[in-house]
């Protein structure tokens, strides 16, 4: 029926347009009366007609209605439009000149065009009515079904279980209770226990929060409703609250089930915004969600799961016991977790024997589950591009570089001066990093441009770090300043290439003083506080000054002192190892990329493969040291 109505409306509109086009072509305008044949005199005017009639040069004319006169002059036809009020005078002139007068009726349009002005609006209105009725009915409705929930029921297709989720053993243990409740609720009710009504998954983007929710539904074997927080709010008032009610009505019909709300912060931000009042529609939606989760109406058998990476902006009423009373932190995986995740993503991929998953996991600190999936996919794409049958370790190495720093711009032309500048800059980073005790060791350095950088240094930490000591922070700042120091010492000039290094070093130094309490002069203080004043759509967390101008000046002095101290350390290391710098730069300009093994050989003065290396040492170079000075 819907298709029939849709087709009827379409054909009615098509017929109306056809009539409109036809009327355009049969228009009875004066211009269609005037002949445009090649034998017709083009610039024949009404005045010419009168003059030639008076001179007796025209013997016969034909008057077409009261709008035009045609005839023959000098063996050529003319066709002249005339104003209706001039017809009587023209007739008198023609009779006086004894011109033979003929008449023809004015051409008229077909009979049906006269009715067009009445029929066309009616046809268009009927077509519009059919179109609106079709849009109001069925699954494609957007008029009368605004209040319907947009949640998608995911109960068919590939089943996801906890076996598909690597790492997160503690998280899966927490969620296993939810699975047990959905499978066997009587076991809990006999003990008087209540399973949490809501489970909030908190963690950075890409850590697998949605995958965990799907795994819970897959393990329990229950319907799984998924909806985004932004799907609740529309431009019409009351739509969001109506959709929340409809969502829970669907859940009750399919209980036991799981309702998963992704990006909860889109609808669950704290109420009572600042300037101009709150977002009324979003707050009504949130209020309805609070009522449905723990109100007068029981929702037995429905477990609400949600995911967010901004738990700090959520309304406290959402997080209280009885609603989202259990928060499960889904953090970035460690080395073991990255190994497990990568193995899962390599299940259906042909992998060469030289691929070491443990090495890849160690080389990717800070990568999330989504990052590891992207890494495996990029490696597979590179293998296909290189026409290989299996994915090799080389493909993974290049994929890691591409994911971290972007694709190499091998076609970009750099002058010899720029290549030399980048080589000294990256060598400064690498050598300082390898000679400091608490700095991360260099995995690779390159002068091939990537992204917006002219060169790169890849550092490989020995292990995942949850905390950093003061000495580790100082060494990290020293490594960041090593590039600028190398430019200054060996090129006797500095460039804009160190801009990002200086920005990161300054940020770290200021954090040491204002956040970590590592300033000797100011002591163990946190300077600046986070306040919870609300702005539109939630809370804005910003750092406010809670100290005097004198303390602010001391902070600037302390930050400057840390930067100066670390810069002097970097200069000292490079000045004591000038020959090593020159060897590394020479090989870097030749090879463009050096790995950790090659770099260590150059630092020790050993040749690379069969290449001979000038092992001469600068007279000012001291023996290699570990630079443990504080």
Swiss-Prot record:
Q: Which residues lie on this side of the membrane: Cytoplasmic?
A: 1-7, 133-630
What PROSITE patterns does this protein's entry cite?
AAA (PS00674)
Where do the annotations place Zn(2+) binding? 425, 429, 501
Q: Where is the composition biased (Acidic residues)?
A: 608-619
Residue ranges under compositional bias (Basic and acidic residues)? 620-630
Which residues are listed for ATP binding in this entry? 203-210
Name the principal localization, coarsely classed: membrane
The record's annotation in PANTHER family points to: ATP-DEPENDENT ZINC METALLOPROTEASE FTSH 1, CHLOROPLASTIC-RELATED (PTHR23076:SF113), METALLOPROTEASE M41 FTSH (PTHR23076)
Q: Where is the signal peptide?
A: none
Q: Which SUPFAM superfamilies match?
A: FtsH protease domain-like, P-loop containing nucleoside triphosphate hydrolases
Active site per database record: 426
Q: Which Gene3D superfamilies match?
A: 1.10.8.60, 3.30.720.210, P-loop containing nucleotide triphosphate hydrolases (3.40.50.300), Peptidase M41 (1.20.58.760)
Q: Which InterPro entries would you find in this protein's record? A: AAA+_ATPase (IPR003593), AAA_lid_3 (IPR041569), ATPase_AAA_core (IPR003959), ATPase_AAA_CS (IPR003960), FtsH (IPR005936), P-loop_NTPase (IPR027417), Pept_M41_FtsH_extracell (IPR011546), Peptidase_M41 (IPR000642)
Q: Where is this region: Disordered?
A: 601-630
**Which UniProt keywords are listed?**
ATP-binding, Cell inner membrane, Cell membrane, Hydrolase, Membrane, Metal-binding, Metalloprotease, Nucleotide-binding, Protease, Transmembrane, Transmembrane helix, Zinc
NCBIfam families in the cross-refs: FtsH_fam (TIGR01241)
Q: What is its EC number?
A: 3.4.24.-
Recorded protein name is ATP-dependent zinc metalloprotease FtsH
| Protein family according to the UniProt entry | In the central section; belongs to the AAA ATPase family.
List the Gene Ontology MF annotations in alphabetical order.
ATP binding; ATP hydrolysis activity; ATP-dependent peptidase activity; metalloendopeptidase activity; zinc ion binding
GO cellular component assignments: plasma membrane
**CDD domains per UniProt:** RecA-like_FtsH
Q: What class of enzyme is it?
A: hydrolase
Per the annotation, how and in what number is the cofactor bound? Binds 1 zinc ion per subunit.
